[in-house]
């Protein structure tokens, strides 16, 4: 099923890039607040 794909998605470089981008956006928006 779908859940079997989750570890592959999480370990993918694209996901890590996206995650770090989201983290940067969240931390920067938190700094502005």
UniProtKB/Swiss-Prot annotation:
Gene Ontology MF terms in the entry: toxin activity
Entry keywords, A to Z: Ion transport, Membrane, Secreted, Target cell membrane, Target membrane, Toxin, Transmembrane, Transport
InterPro entries linked: Pardaxin (IPR009990)
Pfam families referenced in this protein's UniProt entry, alphabetically: Pardaxin
One record GO biological process: monoatomic ion transport
Principal localisation: secreted
GO cellular component: extracellular region; membrane; other organism cell membrane
Keyword Secreted annotated: yes
Cellular location(s): Secreted; Target cell membrane
Domain of life: Eukaryota
Family affiliation: Belongs to the pardaxin family.
Domain notes: Consists of a C-terminal hydrophilic region and a predominantly hydrophobic remainder.
SUBUNIT field: Monomer. In aqueous solution exists as a tetramer.
General function of this protein: Exhibits unusual shark repellent and surfactant properties. Forms voltage-dependent, ion-permeable channels in membranes. At high concentration causes cell membrane lysis.
The protein, known as: Pardaxin P-5
